[in-house]
Amino acid sequence: QDTTYFGMDTWEQRPNPRSPVDSSRGTALTTLLRQLNAIEGDFWIRLLYTHPAHWSDELIKTIAECPKVARYIDIPLQHISDHMLTRMQRETNSQYIRDLIVRIRAGIPGIAVRTTFIVGFPGETEADVEELCEFIRETKFERLGVFRYSQEEGTKAAKMEGQLTTKLKDARYRQTMSLQREIAAEVSARYVGKTLRVLVEEPGVARGEADAPDIDGRVYVPRSLPVGEFADVLITGARDYDLLALPKGEKPKEYKVAKQAQ
């Protein structure tokens, strides 16, 4: 599901795979976000799976102006090498992606950007992987996951030349995830000593605005905090992808590893 495509299928003039979110052409994601933001109550609106090709300045401005829209966006980029983006038919190119991330961060202060990449896609070269790793180092995504390409029967990619071995795909996965773990530790360390607004999901476990359920890290909080409520907590420590907001000497009952760390 591509959330940035919301409403485009109702436009009088049919959109193309690169049409930007534009409410002047009809109902769009920005229309929905503003309507949801106007609803009374205390809640977060979290945007998942936004296709980079459909992002627009209007969408960036709308998110910035709607306080109930979480300062978090999920934007699967899949790769950064033009060679691979073309083979994957991603409707974007390297320079467009680089410029888009800069625009998003400049237009939405405090935004946490989550993305996913695929390694081991047919035809991927060492140069492609090096370019991807350099992009990850430079951009320092707040949240990032990596998938190994899987040759699924019946897909176009399954018939492509240049299929890679499982051993090579595994090696490239380890290479990129090792790099991201270092970056994730840096990102988590920035929160220590700061007060963070969290939503308590279960006794002793909460989630910050920059963490989506199931895929991102957790914030471990005192078990006395009421479940289902927002709370402001002081971050006292960090562990991999997770944050600690516990009194001195208190430890979580157990750590659960985020999927992006697996």
Residue ranges and their predicted role:
Residues 107, 131-170:
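C-terminal, non-catalytic macromolecule-binding modules
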Residues 2, 76-81, 148-153, 202, ...:
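Short, small-residue-rich loop/turn micro-motifs
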Residues 159-262:
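Terminal RNA-binding accessory module
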Residues 43-48, 71-73, 111, 142-145, ...:
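Structural beta-strand/beta-sheet cores of well-ordered domains, especially the beta-sheet scaffolds
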Residues 1-126, 137:
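Conserved SAM/AdoMet-binding glycine-rich loop
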Residues 59-60, 132, 221:
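Short beta-alpha junctions and helix-cap segments that line functional grooves
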Residues 47, 75, 116, 136, ...:
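Conserved, mostly hydrophobic/aromatic
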